[in-house]
């Protein structure tokens, strides 16, 4: 009897172990670990399969509601088609306890992109500034704040954030400083504040002599104040320093030379441009027109 009971106990134990093994095996097949699923979602994102990635990420958060990074990526994917939903998801993550500094940065970064997507630049700016309270030298945040300031045409802020960015990177770009002075000058020009605009354009030139836009718009100021000689001088400098964009003042230069009785200098101007950039199509065409007006062969271009 005792032997029968013992045998029965052994059989029951083996059966229980078998059932447990089957259950665990079945569960592992039917419910893959969330880290594996998350990797699958990332792979789907890389392939551009957003629908599959969303489906997998929803499966991840259903299995593990504490998988913050899965929620984060889910919101990032939804941003393009359902930005409000993305914002709700990302905002809900800000109150999660025990978040690492890295995770907090990623959440605020996601929200900054969300708000920028819907044109809420004030909130986007606040989120980027939140990142700087966590990481004072965060390059992404500083670049983002520069971009936001430029989009809002807030040139003082753009210049300020640019200087902070340059301090962090250790790379000073005088063209950036000059660019914002030019933008300030353009604001003055729009408001007919010619003297203020002139000072800012001159400041831009002094800051970065090789940055062409300062010369272009300083020429425009002189044009409005009827100082055609100085206007011409600055336009020509701009055209030679910005070979790609200089064509925009070619017409002004031709008109100024004509009004000054110096139209014969047009040919030399375009030849100078072609010495600097032999493939400048606009200069080639205009020089051909000048030669044609003079009755000279286009072969004289050579």
Language model regions located:
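Short coil turns that delineate tetratricopeptide repeat
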Residues: 65, 98, 102, 136, ...
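Conserved structural position within tetratricopeptide repeats
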Residues: 61-62, 95, 129-133, 167, ...
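Register position in tetratricopeptide repeats
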Residues: 46, 80, 117, 151, ...
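TPR alpha-solenoid repeat register
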Residues: 70, 103, 107, 141, ...
